Amino acid sequence: MNTLKNKNYYYFCKTLTESIKKNILKYPHINIIYYDNKPNISDENLQAISKFCKKYNIPFFIINNHLLATKMKANGVYLESINRNYKHLSNKKLIIVGSAHNQIEYFIKLRQKCNLIMFSPIFFNQKYSKYKTMGVVKFNLTTRFWKCKAGALGGINQKNLRNLRLINSDNYGVVSLIENKPAL
């Protein structure tokens, strides 16, 4: 982990258990993205995650809901690749992180004024087959001339942690790494 200590990690979560909290605190530059199908301000999990983030000064993002992000005083909003609206552009205080799977979605995220675009899937995981993953070389070639910061997302675990040194990015989405899921 020594060579990757100045990188930014993004963890997607619905709930926080004690083991996940301990793992989160191991990473110095971690950001938490709360995702739920229909998040609302009275959601207990959202309140608990927000409180945890404020206590430990961890940047906090809410998925696809800029109004809720401003009400909860979150640092920003995370826009999924399927989200193609432009309603969030009026709020200048929020950091906007987007997700893309190809160049077309990248250009949509650029128009949405995203500060960071997470490009996925980089490694094999349960959601994508090995034929749909891009790998290190394709990721670097695709994001080489992007006009905004790029992040790697998808399948990052203990098994392929060394490969992150080869990626031309400082931002990674790490779900499997935090939850200690075994490598496939």
Which sequence ranges carry the predicted segments?
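N-terminal amphipathic alpha-helix/helix-capping segment at the start of soluble metabolic enzymes
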Residues: M1-K21
